[in-house]
Curated annotation (Swiss-Prot):
Lineage, top ranks: Eukaryota, Fungi, Dikarya, Ascomycota, Pezizomycotina
Protein name (database record): Hydrolase phiM
The gene coding this protein: tstM
Broad EC category: hydrolase
Function: Hydrolase; part of the gene cluster that mediates the biosynthesis of the antihypercholesterolemic agents phomoidrides which are dimeric anhydrides. Within the pathway, phiM releases the C12-fatty acyl chain from phiA. The pathway begins with the highly reducing polyketide synthase tstA that catalyzes the formation of a C12-fatty acyl-ACP, starting from one acetate and 5 malonate units. The hydrolase tstM is involved in the release of the C12-fatty acyl chain from phiA.
Disulfide bridge partners, by residue number: none
Family annotation (Pfam families): FSH1
Practical uses of the protein: Phomoidrides A and B (also known as CP-225,917 and CP-263,114) are potent inhibitors of Ras farnesyltransferase and squalene synthase. CP-225,917 and CP-263,114 inhibit Ras farnesyl transferase from rat brain with IC(50) values of 6 uM and 20 uoM, respectively. CP-225,917 inhibits squalene synthase with an IC(50) value of 43 uM and CP-263,114 with an IC(50) of 160 uM.
Record-stated family: Belongs to the LovG family.
Alphabetically ordered keywords of this record: Hydrolase
Active-site annotation: S126 (charge relay system)
GO biological process: secondary metabolic process
Highest taxon in the source lineage: Eukaryota
UniProt-listed InterPro entries: AB_hydrolase_fold, FSH-like_dom, LovG
Pathway the protein acts in: Secondary metabolite biosynthesis
Amino acid sequence: MSRAHPKQPVTGRNIPILAITMPALKLLCLHGAGMNSEIMKSHLSSLAKTLEYRNIAQFAYAEGSVETEPGPGITPGLYEGPYYSFHIWPPKAGNLQDEESIQNAYEELLEIIDDEGPFDGLLGFSHGGSFLAELLARYARDNPATDVERLARCAVFINSFPPFRNDPDQNPIIDYELLKHFPKIPTLHVVGTSDFVHEYSTILYEKLHQKAPTSTGLVTHSKGHEIPRDPKVLDKVVAGFEKLNFAVSFSH
């Protein structure tokens, strides 16, 4: 069923115009490694304020349960701990403890969605984006008879890896086979061209664009591994969210 709510037609120069109001997307946000929900809320504050004011999206925040050291760019004292990841990060290939940690995080996030949802979509930054990509792909693979939209009808990735495991030399090995199962839902990708994970964020975008070319959005900026706050970049990101909202509203 469409989320769009048509208002009464109005007329301009004898041409009927249908004014349509789309409700705000309700998104559950997943922070990066060595962060927490309050830090994520702080980093998203400029974007969230604009999106909520314009009734495009509203955010809720999940928090990981694996306590870690502060992540990249997280300065103790400036950002209060404790600091968390959703699972052991980065995960190592063939490591049973890491796989168990991912499985625990998977089950915990499904429980959060069941308890606090429903949500229209999920948003992930860095590690959080990699985890949500794995979550949705695994769920779609393991539950072929269940509509994945009970978890999310869209996804937003900010400077995110695809699902991967590190080899012994600490090189990410992307799980392309798992990524084939990612559902055909609208996605938005925000990618920094100066980011150290730019190559991997681009791969994630390209693979999902192949699955749903008409509903996969891309916003690039010149910054690094951060959630953009520059006003000009924010304008582009907000426009990307508007298109995402439209795609979700008219996806059925």
